[in-house]
Amino acid sequence: MSKKNNLLVAASGTGGHIFPALAVSKEVEDKWNIHWLGVKQRLDSNLIPKKYNLRTLSIKTPRKNIFLFYQYIEILMSTFQIIRILKEKKINLVFTTGGYISAPTIIASKFLRIPVIIHESNLIPGMVTKYFGFLCNYVLLGFKNTNSYLRNCKTIFTGTPLREQFYKSNPLPEWVPKGKGPLLIVMGGSQGAKAINQILNESLEFLLKKQFRIVHIIGESNQQPFYIKNTKNYIQKKFTNEVAALIQNCDLVISRSGAGTINELIEAEKPSILIPYPDSKNNHQEKNAMIIAESGGSVLINQNNISKEVFEETLERIFKIKSKKGVNHYEILDLMKRNMVNNKIKSKNEIKKFINYFLKEF
């Protein structure tokens, strides 16, 4: 049996960084020993399998304030720590998905002349990809048009890999409310979204009167959860591993518009109402949302414009019943479903090809 090479995966923070890296790790673990580098006090310890040898560093989120200098010192110290880890584990290749762990990892890898691949899942590249992408051997893109923002990088369009469950059909979980009413999945990403939770809280009475069934994922890091007692047609959870099954079997998703969510909706061909996070870097969540909103597969509502009235009117319009040849159907929802089919992107094995390419080249 040939000896496996060592792959360091540097991904941390939000599900948008972690889930694509997990998907890639699962695809290549038969040929590589996986070592995972993350950040303390984030989602990493809950999501990363023990077999991936998770190591965490203390890196705080950079902020524009008087302590910025000390944060850069912290990043520099992290770079030296990562150099030691790369040497200790005899790493042959580094794969990263952006985020605060990525910058020192890229610098450390280039110092040791270890090849680096970074994957950029957003349409508008993040800060690390923008400023450090040129140091990487390849920048893999979730969307084709991202190439125009990275002229000095070696870019390859691969799409964004998703969790394994999204590539197969999954039954609806037993705990989901039963009934004939439309099923809504409301979620704010792995960290939750206060604005989405709030608007749902305000409109819940209206939705239940309209016979909607609702699964509400409030997020792990929501410090003050909008606790509402579960009822026949409403279930609230902090987190679930059954997101693929929920999205595949629901009628409509209401969510933020991180790149991971956009690609999950595209894969499942699922209509949505998207409420982009307004403080995302370079407004990238709104740009992500526009990819499917412009094709008619989603309704984009800016957080500054959303209200109880706007939210309820939007849902009433989407679920307005039309009769055709004696058969009732949701005309706008059905049109949104057809439009989502045109957005299909297949990306499951593309990144695997490029990672395994380095087995031969290095």
UniProtKB/Swiss-Prot annotation:
It is a peripheral membrane protein. Belongs to the glycosyltransferase 28 family. MurG subfamily. The gene is murG. Cell wall formation. Catalyzes the transfer of a GlcNAc subunit on undecaprenyl-pyrophosphoryl-MurNAc-pentapeptide (lipid intermediate I) to form undecaprenyl-pyrophosphoryl-MurNAc-(pentapeptide)GlcNAc (lipid intermediate II). InterPro entries: GlcNAc_MurG, Glyco_trans_28_C, GlycoTrans_28_N. This is UDP-N-acetylglucosamine--N-acetylmuramyl-(pentapeptide) pyrophosphoryl-undecaprenol N-acetylglucosamine transferase. It is found in: Cell inner membrane. UDP-N-acetyl-alpha-D-glucosamine binds at residues 14-16, 122, 163, 190, 285. The lineage of its organism: Bacteria, Bacillati, Cyanobacteriota, Cyanophyceae, Synechococcales. One of its GO terms (biological process) is cell division.
